Amino acid sequence: MNGSEPKIEIFKPFGEAFELTKKILFQPFDLKKWLVIGFAAWLANLGGGGGFNYSYNRREEMQKVNETLSQIPHSLLVTAICVLVCFVLVVIVLFAWLRARGCFMFIDCIAKNRGAIAEPWRGFRNEGNSYFLFSLLVGIVLLVFAAVFSLPLVLPIIKDSTFLRTHHVYVIVAIAALIFAMIFLLLAWSLIASFMLAVMYRQRCRASEAFTIVTRLIATHPGEMLLYCLFWIVLALATALVACLATCATCCIAAIPYVGTVILLPLFVLLCSFSLLFIRQFGPDYDVWASFVPPEFLPILLSLSSVPATSAPSSNPPPEPPPRPSI
């Protein structure tokens, strides 16, 4: 490896993220700070949670719903459906905006080891709005791609009602290909988005600029990014398992919005810290601690060679050369 190139590791940033999580949440433990950071984490993951579905007597319930709908005038039913669809779209867009703003609040809480809402909400307004609009555009592109990609499956079914019964293999392959393509695109966007947030926080740039920077970085270091992505998937699966166990252990209390985030806050802080510490290895332009390092973070962050001299000035400067003898 060239001496000027950074050494990119996977497990070392994870270990440092674990130490950072302990510093932020447990050393010392502050309930108010925990609740504030939990709120920022909840906003940053708004709309990403799930729930439980209890499917008993589902057929009887659907029959009652159909009977009720059949008694409603057709024009009124169509109007109600249109209003409901518009309301759902507005809620989705609102959640996406709050989530975009919350991402920068959560990163700020981790980077500066504090529980703050108002200051990062105002300070990163432009970046949050830019990221929201860009994410909305990406979501629309993904929906259009899914619709276009599903046409070879949907059109034959519309034209021929017996198509499903006579072309089992084609239907299965088409559905599997669509699911695989969407999972791949969603994983790619998740990877890019997590790094975009760090770049936008550090450089205070627009989302389109951060997207260009991150995609160029991924193209330059494909091997390291692939390892990171695989390790992050393992962490995500482990987090989902822990979340399920916590939900069962707390009698579904952990499934309540915000409450579950507060209970599982160490996991959210750990995952976000790991992403920030990993991309930090590529240089000061990707380092959210480049301009400010909390003093309590110095023992952890100084172990990375990518920390610039401006964020942690050396206490032992090199000795000055001896004075020249006078002639």
What label would you give each PLM region?
Residues 2-19, 23-36, 40-48, 52-56, ...:
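Juxtamembrane transition segments at transmembrane-helix termini in multipass membrane proteins
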Residues 19, 23-26, 122-142, 216-235:
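Alpha-helical transmembrane segments of multi-pass membrane proteins
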Residues 76-80, 84, 116-143, 167-182:
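Alpha-helical membrane-spanning segments of integral membrane proteins, especially the hydrophobic core
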Residues 51-84, 147-179:
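Long, highly hydrophobic alpha-helical transmembrane signal-anchor segments
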